[in-house]
Amino acid sequence: LEYQDALSFHMDIVPCIPLDESISNLMYEDINNYILDENLSKTITNHAVSITDTDKDNYPYIDSGWNISNPEGYALWFEANMNKSKKAMLLMEKAQVDNLPNFNKKTTLQRAIQLLKRHRDNMFKGNEDSKAISIIITTLATHAYNGEDNLAEALKNILTNMKRFINPHYPRIPNPTHPSED
C-alpha cells in the first residue's frame, strides 16, 4: 500500500471480525443514549468491529476482549452532522433538489474543520507531540456545529461551544460511535 507520506497520513490496517451480538446490543444502547437517533444508532452499530492489538495478550486468538473500532460508523455520524445545514436550507426553501454526491463540494463543517486543523498545525509546528490529533478536532467541531451555512459564523460557534463537549471525567471526549471510549 502506497500513499503520500509527505501529507502526514496515518493508516492502521488490522484484522477484524464482526461484533458479538451481545456486545453489539450493548453498544447500540450506548450509542442510542448518546446520539438519540434510533436509525442512525442502528446504522452506526452495524459497522462496529472487533480488532486485534499486538500489545495485548489476546492478540493471537479470537477473544471477546478485543478492542472495538468503528471507522465507517464514525464517517456516517460525521456525514449526518455535516448535512445539517443542507437539510435546514432545503426545508426553509421547500425546494426539490436532486441528490448530489456528498463530497464533491466541501460543506461548511468540512471547511471549518480544515481551518481548525491548519491552525493547529501552524500553532504546534516543531512541537508535534503536543498537538491535538485530528479525530479530536473533528469530533469536537462536529458536536459544536449547529448547521451554519456561513463559515465565519460556523467557526465562531464551533470555537465557542467546543469546550462544552469535553467531559471533566473519563471519557473526556467520547467517541460518538463508541461512547465509553475516550
Kindly label every feature range from the protein language model:
Residues L1-S69:
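Conserved catalytic core of two-metal-ion nucleotidyltransferases
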Residues S8-D20, Y74, I137, A141, ...:
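Generic detector of bulky aromatic hydrophobic side chains
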Residues S50-Q110:
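Long, charge-rich alpha-helical interaction segments
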Residues N81, M89-D182:
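Conserved nucleotidyltransferase catalytic core and NTase-mimicking acidic/glycine-rich helix/loop elements
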